[in-house]
Amino acid sequence: MAFVPPQAGYDRAITVFSPDGRLFQVNYAREAVKRGATAVGVKWKGGVVLAVEKRITSRLIEPSSYEKIFQIDDHIAAAPSGIIADARVLVDRARLEAQIYRLTYGEPVPLTVLVKKICDLKQAHTQYGGVRPFGAALLMAGVNEKPELYETDPSGAYFEWKAVAIGSGRNTAMAIFEEHYSDDIDMEGAIKLAILALAKTLEEPSPESIEVAYITLDEKRWKKLDKEEVAKYLNEILEEIKEEEVEEREEDYSELDQNY
């Protein structure tokens, strides 16, 4: 007779809590997000920017066909991490809810309303049998009266952030945000900070591996940076990183000189 671990029942059943109060399947969904491509968002007073890692696994893939920032409405976009097929289902649902709201009320859906609806759907998939949690987290960003940036968790929880990252590079990117983000950051600074945080999580950052989009309060319409614009920002950032590394090495040598 095969040995069955004590936690096996809680491990397989989505609706059953373990004795220490956990839903194992929700934890596993979070693990899928932690292994996913990194996505970051940065907010400034006049708008918000999203930047996402594009994992091009073959040189035969057309990079332009690999979309990682999804437009929900004119004023709202989402960047996923985790199981992208799950994320597409959430994106399609968000687009539907945005259309229903616009047809019903004759105005764009507030981002907070849309985030709550998506998180209600996520939460329902942790409570009923016959389904599993969505193995995807979304960064949802947009503007109504002000710029907003939310992280949605597989459990259905959501949080508003000034700057945030999800995916495998979360810890590295969040450390950079903690060090460099300020409330008076401008659009140029926010875009550069988002690309910097993403570049630090990549072994070989390139314009093909980074997708960037932003929205401003003035225009209230998402715009994606083309490859040339991403390359310009990335080259500036990589130059700054090299200069910092040179300065650090010079400091190390000056400390050695003092010991002689």
From Swiss-Prot:
Q: Describe regulators of its activity.
A: The formation of the proteasomal ATPase PAN-20S proteasome complex, via the docking of the C-termini of PAN into the intersubunit pockets in the alpha-rings, triggers opening of the gate for substrate entry. Interconversion between the open-gate and close-gate conformations leads to a dynamic regulation of the 20S proteasome proteolysis activity.
GO MF term (any one): threonine-type endopeptidase activity
Report the domain of life of the source organism. Answer: Archaea
Tell me which CDD domains the record gives.
proteasome_alpha_archeal (cd03756)
Cellular component GO terms held in the UniProt record: cytoplasm; proteasome core complex, alpha-subunit complex
Question: Which Gene Ontology BP terms does the record give?
Answer: proteasomal protein catabolic process; ubiquitin-dependent protein catabolic process
Q: Which SMART domains match?
A: Proteasome_A_N (SM00948)
Q: Which Gene3D superfamilies match?
A: Glutamine Phosphoribosylpyrophosphate, subunit 1, domain 1 (3.60.20.10)
Where is it mainly found? cytoplasm
Q: Where in the cell is it found?
A: Cytoplasm
Q: Which UniProt keywords apply?
A: Cytoplasm, Proteasome
Q: Point out the coiled-coil segments of this chain.
A: none
InterPro entries hit by this protein:
Ntn_hydrolases_N, Proteasome_alpha, Proteasome_alpha-type, Proteasome_asu_arc, Proteasome_asu_N, Proteasome_sua/b
Summarize the subunit comment: The 20S proteasome core is composed of 14 alpha and 14 beta subunits that assemble into four stacked heptameric rings, resulting in a barrel-shaped structure. The two inner rings, each composed of seven catalytic beta subunits, are sandwiched by two outer rings, each composed of seven alpha subunits. The catalytic chamber with the active sites is on the inside of the barrel. Has a gated structure, the ends of the cylinder being occluded by the N-termini of the alpha-subunits. Is capped at one or both ends by the proteasome regulatory ATPase, PAN.
Family according to the record: Belongs to the peptidase T1A family.
The function of this protein is:
Component of the proteasome core, a large protease complex with broad specificity involved in protein degradation.
Protein name per Swiss-Prot or TrEMBL: Proteasome subunit alpha
**What is the primary gene name for this protein?**
psmA
